């Protein structure tokens, strides 16, 4: 059985293997979409394929849509050549359930895959053709937060962005320049309206995307590449809207165990590949079942019936509240605590950590106990139910191959939101954050993790982080097993408002974190002993 249009003709084989196939005519959907695309998506990776592609598939199955999604890859063009084209743009979606069973379905909703290459006329002209079509209703994005960044920490444009500014729309290279150039084509054609929707997992994502597109447009205006009217078009939300959204579905890299099961079931050529850009991707995508997408309902040219596929459509304030609930209380703070302690305690699977008595207690304390008193309640979702599902269904799912090492990536960029916001809320409500124990313990655990030595005294490789070098320098001289080597090195980190959003000493917990950290560097087994002490 091959995952191709030809291969799907053997319906009985797929059904016998327990793999559901689309009931709609995949070729017809592709033809409809090609003629008049309604939805274009930038960032053709895993969460897009299973979640967003799955939404479109649901609408097609229900007869609520007759078009799919046009996929555009902006970063790793190998994905198009190795994962889309050889498989006729089909995806095998595998939902991993906590009881060990899986739901498997082929999605036929991704109708075309294009590379965002302005230097390849065939690709570039096709994108222009799509963008000038008035039928286009929305473009969406999962390109990660980094994909929107135009400037480095020094406030200067990245060199590749400066090159895009200098070279103009016809030679766009970065995702933001490509999108801005294509929006300019739409403006020049007939100024048709459009919704530009970030679906990346970062707060105020619509605002980030809007700022980046507008910055690029204004830089081009200053150089004479675009008209003043183009900037006005982008600035008018009745013409071009930038709705905010909140997305949530844990989508780990393709698991070997899933690949083996599919091969045993008779599916051929399904193994993951590693692209030249180091993307680990396969013809199948595996993910958890629970999923949430909340979008600000601001679509000036109409939209697909997303609510029929389980998407929450609401106002901006509610989107913001849902996002804040998730990232500051109900999911992300728990994940980060498990990530840093998991690495130090030698875990390689997040789910296994939930069987660890102290770590289980830690996440119960961080979310339901310490987070809930100051949680943001969005109204459309219950924070208590959400965190209950996270702790009892989502994180303990043993078939989710998610690792503490993956989640520990870029922690310096996350602790301000994941812990700093709750700490600030405690200061606002109680005058200080001294009531907190589990959150300071999580922060102490991150500092201990930064030493790159596990609880048995062995070195381990820390995950990538833009501040890793700076943080390593700040902690210089500290030796595990020699508490006397600590001379206040944590102070510059814990007082750094750029990291935590607040000076933790002013919040009343800086010294407490230092003391916990000191206990954790006492020697082999000290991290476990410290967790036992505070999470008894």
Where do the language-model regions lie?
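Substrate/ligand-engaging "lid" and interaction regions
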Residues: 1-42, 46-536
């Amino acid at each position: 059985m091959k995952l191709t249009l030809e291969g799907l003709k053997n319906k009985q084989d797929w059904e016998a293997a327990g793999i559901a196939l689309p009931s709609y005519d995949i070729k017809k959907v592709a033809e409809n979409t090609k003629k008049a695309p309604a939805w274009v998506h930038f960032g053709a990776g895993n969460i897009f394929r299973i979640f967003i592609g799955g939404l479109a598939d649901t609408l097609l199955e229900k007869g609520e849509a007759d078009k799919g999604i046009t996929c555009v890859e902006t970063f790793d063009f190998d994905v198009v050549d190795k994962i889309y084209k050889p498989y006729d743009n089909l995806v095998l979606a595998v939902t991993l359930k906590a009881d060990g069973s899986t739901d498997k379905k082929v999605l036929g909703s991704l109708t075309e895959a294009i590379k965002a290459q302005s230097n390849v006329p065939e690709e570039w002209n096709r994108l222009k053709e799509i963008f000038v079509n008035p039928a286009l209703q929305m473009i969406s994005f999962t390109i990660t937060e980094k994909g929107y960044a135009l400037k480095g920490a020094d406030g200067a444009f990245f060199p590749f962005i400066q090159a895009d500014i200098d070279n103009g729309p016809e030679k766009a290279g970065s995702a933001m320049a490509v999108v801005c150039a294509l929006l300019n084509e739409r403006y020049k054609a007939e100024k048709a309206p459009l919704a530009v929707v970030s679906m990346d997992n970062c707060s105020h994502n619509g605002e980030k995307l809007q700022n980046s597109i507008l910055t690029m447009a204004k830089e081009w205006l200053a150089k004479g590449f675009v008209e003043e009217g183009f900037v006005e078009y982008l600035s008018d939300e009745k013409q071009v809207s930038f709705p905010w959204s909140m997305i949530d579905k844990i989508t780990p890299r393709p698991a070997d165990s899933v690949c083996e099961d599919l091969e045993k079931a008779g599916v051929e050529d399904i193994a993951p590949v590693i692209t030249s850009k180091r993307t680990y991707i396969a013809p199948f995508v595996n993910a958890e079942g629970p999923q949430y997408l909340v979008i600000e309902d601001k679509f000036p040219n109409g939209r697909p019936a997303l609510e029929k596929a389980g998407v929450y459509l609401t106002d901006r304030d509610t989107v913001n509240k849902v996002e804040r609930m998730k990232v500051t209380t109900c999911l992300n703070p728990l994940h980060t605590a498990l990530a840093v302690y998991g690495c130090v305690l030698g875990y390689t699977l997040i789910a296994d950590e939930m069987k660890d008595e102290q770590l289980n207690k830690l996440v119960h304390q961080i979310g339901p106990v310490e987070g809930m008193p100051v949680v943001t309640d969005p109204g459309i979702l219950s924070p208590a139910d959400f965190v209950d599902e996270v702790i009892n269904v989502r994180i303990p799912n043993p078939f989710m191959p998610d690792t503490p090492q993956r989640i520990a990536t870029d922690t310096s960029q996350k602790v301000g939101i994941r812990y700093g916001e709750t700490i600030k809320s405690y200061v606002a409500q109680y005058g200080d954050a001294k009531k907190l124990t589990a959150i300071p313990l999580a922060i102490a655990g991150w500092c201990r993790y930064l030493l790159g030595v596990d609880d048995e005294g062995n070195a381990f490789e820390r995950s990538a982080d833009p501040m890793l070098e700076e943080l390593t320098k700040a902690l210089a001289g500290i030796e595990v097993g020699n508490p006397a080597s600590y001379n206040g090195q944590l102070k510059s980190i814990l007082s750094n408002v750029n990291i935590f959003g607040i000076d933790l000493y002013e919040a009343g917990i800086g010294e407490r974190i230092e003391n916990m950290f000191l206990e954790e560097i006492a020697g082999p087994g000290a991290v476990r002993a410290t967790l036992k002490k505070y999470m008894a």
